[in-house]
Design a protein with these regions (language model features):
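Catalytic Walker B motif of ABC-type/P-loop ATPase nucleotide-binding domains
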Residues: 194-198
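ABC transporter nucleotide-binding domain
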Residues: 212-300
Length: 353
């Protein structure tokens, strides 16, 4: 999408340097407790009690040019705080970060022209105006020359098939339609780094799939560096090769999707479709955790024993069909959240790379 005949004037990141580098980044907030009851509330006006909340706890992260990284975690894990820090919206309590060689919270003009932030629950489009008007305002803010603006706008609009929406007030659009136009606005100035904060939240399956295809295409073509925060595994599986799992402000895992299965599970799921509902006692004698659903049996078998035990199971049960699968990623990550486990990360602290 970027026309090589119109090169950027921004200084590139030095060769060998990561696009994003974060070291010991932490953010703390002081919150005031609100006592219950009228008298307690009045007393609290003169004797306010506060406590410190750690939104981010000494995070280390290194992201190279062209990586598409998913940051997965439950609500309150620190994902949005992390993106706000990298965007320069807030400043850290301690630690350091550079994005494209700049310190984000210094908010230099050069830095602001080279990244974009899209938040699924925040609008950057003017609510009462058509998106086309917001796009023109965006053009002036980022000083995009007219030929480049029109070329980029038309390409993005056609990719998302939203041309018919451009003249409708944003308030009249569905959530999915609005999010598509938010992405167009964010990409008009052709940023090198894109931060996406839960862009698919609240969207139906069709809208999610459309955004997945668009983001995969644009990221590959532009070689943008992207960090996507989400709590949907579908976003991760569709878009990212690298996964960062966070909870309570700390990194539990940083690595590939394939590695997380090997490191955090020791078994596979074997599903047997039988001719008839099985004898429970016979299934229990197999000695594996199991679930029976009519004529279907679901076993959890140690991955190192599959080849040894599966032939015997198939001979004795009247099996019509069998499948062997890894434990679903959703289940693995949910267990990580419950246990707070850092086993299997690339570093001793759970903050690899």
């Amino acid at each position: 999408m970027h026309n090589s005949s119109q090169p950027r004037t921004d200084a590139p990141t030095a060769a060998g340097e990561p696009v994003i580098e974060v070291r010991g980044l932490a953010k703390e907030y002081r919150v005031f407790d609100k006592p219950e009851g009228l008298m307690a509330s009045v007393t609290g006006l003169f004797n306010r009690k506060s406590r410190v909340v750690e939104a981010l706890r000494g995070v280390d992260l290194r992201v190279e040019k062209g990586e598409f990284v998913a940051m997965l975690g439950p609500n309150g894990a620190g994902k949005t705080t992390f993106l706000k820090l990298l965007s320069g919206i807030i400043t850290p309590t301690r630690g350091s970060a550079t994005v494209l060689g700049s310190v984000p919270w210094e908010r230099t003009d050069d830095f602001r022209r080279r990244f974009a932030l899209v938040m699924g629950q925040r609008n950057q489009l003017w609510w009462d105006l058509p998106a086309a008007e917001s796009f023109r305002l965006h053009k002036e803010i980022y000083r995009i020359d007219t030929p480049r603006f029109e070329r980029t706008r038309d390409e993005l609009v056609d990719l998302l098939d939203v041309r018919k929406l451009l003249l409708r007030p944003v308030r009249d659009l569905s959530l999915g339609e609005r999010m598509k136009l938010e992405l167009v606005a964010a990409l008009l100035h052709e940023p090198e780094v894109l931060f996406l904060d839960e862009p698919t939240i609240g969207l139906d399956v069709v809208a999610q799939h459309s955004l997945h295809r668009f983001l995969a295409h644009v990221q590959a073509e532009r070689q943008m560096t992207v960090i996507l925060t989400t709590h949907y595994m579908k976003d991760v599986a569709a878009l990212c090769k690298r996964l960062v799992v966070v909870t309570e402000g700390s990194i539990l895992y940083d690595g590939s999707l394939e590695q997380i299965v090997d490191r955090f599970t020791s078994h596979k799921i074997v599903t047997l479709d039988l001719d008839a509902p099985p004898d429970r006692a016979a299934i229990d004698r197999l000695g594996f955790p199991c679930e029976i659903r009519g004529p279907q049996v679901i076993l959890r078998i140690d991955r190192t024993r599959i080849a040894d035990v599966l032939p015997g199971i198939l001979r004795g049960q009247g099996v019509r069909d069998v499948s062997v699968e890894d434990v679903p990623l959703e289940e693995i990550v949910a267990e990580m959240f419950r246990s707070g486990s850092t086993a299997g990360t690339d570093g001793a602290t759970g903050a690899p790379r």
